[in-house]
A protein has these predicted regions:
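Generic N-terminal leader/processing signal
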Residues: 2-3, 28, 44, 53, ...
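Extracellular repetitive beta-rich solenoid segments
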Residues: 2-44
Length: 303
């Protein structure tokens, strides 16, 4: 038998699986194929890779579960997320399409369009959906401008006779707002049915009727989430507060700073025989005599 030193043996750089490699097990010299040696050496590495892959799969699944609500395409999910993205200078056909479909893809609370110098901000999705004496079945986006469009009186004198529907604001002073909004969104402005007060007795709203609405002042519930100054039941006198706007707009719930724009603006609620509810420029809830020239900051829906 010829004996050679290891350094004298011909070296190979690409061993085949069948090559034999000497190995000592502590009792004597043995041989192991290169394939078996490679498999044994890689066992802990393969185990680590398998464990890592399983963990990654679990982590990805967890992340997907957490992210999923952010991409659900329905009003409920989109009403729960404030984003505040600039959507452009006009309502696009693509945006209108997803609104009509009720999926609201890539539209979230706080997103806005800047049209004709006015910032029109998304305040809610499907807020009036399924409401009205004639059911609203049109998917829609509620819009509220960031700033007051202009100033106007509720009435020429400090009276609330006829409530909101009987006011100068409703009959005349909202006309400019309707024109401005129509110029910005055209025939996308939605007409839907709401209940509005039309009579007052001793400072209480005492009557109302279902009307078709396109552009109207907000009520306290839409802004604050509850009534603040408008009259409620005394046990013997029950106001005609049969409104469909029973909950706060998501815009104001998710980002309360949007309630105040540092300009006072009217709400449509009768507070007394002389005044209507008001959001004061300092951010506090308030009311004022109807003859004050206050801000007009209406809400409306587009589809």
């Amino acid at each position: 038998m010829i004996t050679k030193k290891l350094t004298e043996v011909t070296q190979v750089t690409s061993p085949s699986d069948g090559y034999l490699t000497p190995i000592h097990d502590g009792t004597g010299l043995k041989a192991i194929t290169f394939a078996n040696l490679r498999s044994k050496v890689n066992e802990p590495v393969n185990a680590s890779i398998t464990a890592l892959s399983e963990k990654e799969a679990t982590d990805i699944s967890t992340v997907n579960a957490l992210v999923a609500p952010l991409v659900y395409n329905n009003a409920g999910a989109h009403n729960a997320i404030y984003r505040g993205k600039n959507l452009g200078t006009s309502l696009t056909d693509a945006q209108s399409k997803v609104i009509k479909a009720g999926t609201f893809d890539d539209l979230y609370i706080g997103d806005y369009w800047v049209i004709n110098g006015v910032t029109w901000r998304i305040a809610g999705f499907d807020y009036w959906y399924r409401c009205g004496d004639t059911e609203c079945t049109t998917h829609h986006v509620v819009i509220v401008p960031d700033s007051n469009l202009y100033n106007a009186k509720m009435n020429d004198t400090n009276i609330t006779t006829g409530a909101y529907v009987g006011s100068l604001m409703y009959t005349t002073n909202l006309a400019t707002a309707k024109t401005t909004i129509s110029n910005a969104f055209g025939d996308h402005v939605l007409s839907h049915r709401i209940y509005l007060n039309n009579a007052v007795t001793n400072g209480y709203p005492s009557g109302g009727a279902w009307v078709s609405s396109t552009v109207d002042l907000m009520c306290e519930e839409m802004v604050y989430g509850s009534g603040i100054f408008h009259p409620v039941s005394t046990g013997s006198t029950v106001p005609a507060n049969h409104r469909v706007e029973k909950s706060q707009l998501p815009l104001f719930a998710l980002e309360p700073s949007r309630i105040t724009n540092r300009g006072t603006y009217w709400l449509r609620d009768v507070v007394s025989a002389a005044g209507f509810a008001f959001v004061y420029g300092s951010g506090n809830a308030d009311y004022y005599g109807a003859s004050l020239s206050g801000g007009v900051r209406p809400a409306f829906a587009i589809s």
